Amino acid sequence: MPKQVVEVLVEGGKATPGPPLGPAIGPLGLNVKQVVDKINEATKDFAGMQVPVKIIVDPVTKQFEIEVGVPPTSQLIKKELGLEKGSGEPKHNIVGNLTMEQVIKIAKMKKDQMLALTLKAAAKEVIGTALSMGVTVEGKDPREVQKEIDEGVYDELFEKAEKE
């Protein structure tokens, strides 16, 4: 019998046997507490963030494994800036400012899950998310910073980051 995959979004380090986890894995005959403990251990570094988790279950042996994804870009931006939430009106209400170093740090975390082929392209995706959240980059409108990336203004930072 093929393995079954259950995908859930849980708060890092704070998964509980209640929804969405319990109802999703209970019918598979797993020890829910064991699964919850393993997820909490695997996601403790992402405390306070929503984290995508895959639970891969062998329905015959009841063995399972946990795969932890990287939180959504918006969650990483909020954590980096210590924000509760993004702006309800991103064009009128700015809630924070990212440095280019912070943008690159987030882009490196997310790059494997993005369609971007280069770190520059990944950084531009992060900046796009910042724009939709009401977050400026280097104190400027995120669209302006995306143009500056295309013009090579931050090339030194990208070269340094790619060597790390």
Curated annotation (Swiss-Prot):
One protein family per Pfam: Ribosomal_L11
Residue ranges that the Swiss-Prot or TrEMBL entry lists as coiled coil: none
Entry's Gene Ontology molecular function annotations: large ribosomal subunit rRNA binding; structural constituent of ribosome
Gene Ontology annotations for the cellular component aspect, listed alphabetically: large ribosomal subunit
Record keywords, A-Z: Ribonucleoprotein, Ribosomal protein, RNA-binding, rRNA-binding
SUPFAM superfamilies linked: Ribosomal L11/L12e N-terminal domain, Ribosomal protein L11, C-terminal domain
GO terms (BP aspect): translation
Oligomeric and partner information: Part of the ribosomal stalk of the 50S ribosomal subunit. Interacts with L10 and the large rRNA to form the base of the stalk. L10 forms an elongated spine to which L12 dimers bind in a sequential fashion forming a multimeric L10(L12)X complex.
Record protein name field: Large ribosomal subunit protein uL11
Source species: Pyrococcus furiosus (strain ATCC 43587 / DSM 3638 / JCM 8422 / Vc1)
Gene: rpl11
